[in-house]
Amino acid sequence: MKNTAVTFKESKLRNEKLTMLTAYDYSTAKIIDEAGINGILVGDSLGMVCLGHEDTLSVTMEDMIHHTRAVTRGAKNTLVVADMPFMSYQTSVYDSVVNAGRLIKEGRAQVVKLEGGIEVCDKIEAIVKASIPVMAHIGLTPQSVNAFGGFKVQGKDKEAAKELIRAAKAVEKAGAFAVVLECVPTKLAELISKEISIPTIGIGAGAGCDGQILVYQDMLGMYSDFTPKFVKKYANLSEEMNKAFTKYIEEVKDGVFPGPEHGFKISDDVLEKLY
């Protein structure tokens, strides 16, 4: 069954947990799609895990369109959500609609995601009015890392917690069909999930959310620069890849690879005519 913004909301009504992972290329998207994951986020996290930047701020619209287009070719039943990169929507309502439209039209995404609470509700409303579904994102919003002073848990004191509750209700009212809660205390995220009717997708927000999302390189043990506390590693592919690469080097140097079975034959008759 094809996952859509509508089926996400229906899953919450049925109390069925939603699953999401990031992807940035065709091959990974195809594997994730075949596994039955509900949603793929083409995240601006690609700036860190794919392009080697220290944060997400350097990612451009062209980067997002390029990677989103690749992902949508591999995702047949999985909902594809494209991140709106830094400064693609903060500048004006007009810019937010235009750039959201580019991610849908050129990137072929089904949904766009933007970070922020009450301060971006005018953008959410305008994008939704343009018939583009929006996934909101509150709590730790990586594009605001400089304002936060680093990657820190949000909503730990009374006022900050109340502000997150207000933000969740505001983005719902603005028309978002779902909201990501990032690095929010578990009990607060559970409370927010009960307070709003749209699905909450948690990342570092505990099991009380309506769904979960992880960066796939994190959960597969492929990104060694930094592993957040909230990540569970389901594999250690970095180690396995290193072993495979080392073995490849050894076999090439020792003349073991390629073997006869990896080559193509030519008849002796043809070969003799070459001399």
From Swiss-Prot:
- Cystine pairs annotated here are none
Species of origin: Enterococcus faecalis (strain ATCC 700802 / V583)
Q: Does the keyword Ligase apply?
A: no
Keywords (alphabetical) are: Cytoplasm, Magnesium, Metal-binding, Pantothenate biosynthesis, Transferase
Q: What is this protein called?
A: 3-methyl-2-oxobutanoate hydroxymethyltransferase
Q: Name one Pfam family in it.
A: Pantoate_transf
Its annotated compartments are:
Cytoplasm
Active site (record annotation):
182 (proton acceptor)
**Single GO MF annotation:** magnesium ion binding
Q: What does this protein do?
A: Catalyzes the reversible reaction in which hydroxymethyl group from 5,10-methylenetetrahydrofolate is transferred onto alpha-ketoisovalerate to form ketopantoate.
